[in-house]
Amino acid sequence: MNAVRRKKLIWVAATLAGAIIAVLLVIYAIGQQTDYYFDPTAIAAGDAPQNKRIRAGGMVVKDSVRRDPNDDLKVQFEITDFNATVPVSYQGILPDLFAENSGVVATGEMQGKVFVASEVLAKHDENYMPPEVAASLKEDHAAKGVTPTSEQFSPAIPVKQTAGEGNHTTSTLQE
């Protein structure tokens, strides 16, 4: 093998090795940033891993919010999907929209039977429910054969575009 060919072969091998290492590092980084979602039923069943970052979502149980009298930032509350309830411990400032009987998604890890949250996100208006929570509740209601009375599970009414006067269009609700 002559020197030019050998040099090209080494260059191609080094480039290929570098590309493989870069791809593996990207895959590793994505894996580290992935947070799996668990509803309270799955957490109570023991499906959620211990001491691994996950997301948990549900409705805050009424009268479950307790603040530590010695530390104003330490809060304990419970979340439910109406099948199971999970205790949550959080150290920090809760979002302004955090309230009992409202939807939350918390990021943290399971430590024993308690979900220790590092971040708590609250719903942003009175009609919003996190998509994962809504899907979980809808599945639970379907499994029980219960039709939810809440409009939170109803699909949005499609909007039909009709031609109006001039260069604009008018939106009307389809029936």
UniProtKB/Swiss-Prot annotation:
Keywords: Cell inner membrane, Cell membrane, Cytochrome c-type biogenesis, Heme, Iron, Membrane, Metal-binding, Signal-anchor, Transmembrane, Transmembrane helix. GO terms for molecular function: heme binding; metal ion binding. The chain crosses the membrane at residues 9-29. The keyword Flavoprotein does not apply. One of its GO terms (cellular component) is plasma membrane. Its main location: membrane. Gene3D superfamilies: Nucleic acid-binding proteins. It holds the Pfam family CcmE. Residues 142-175 are annotated as: Disordered. It comes from Psychrobacter sp. (strain PRwf-1). It is a single-pass type II membrane protein. Residues 1-8 are cytoplasmic. This is Cytochrome c-type biogenesis protein CcmE. Heme binds at H124, Y128.
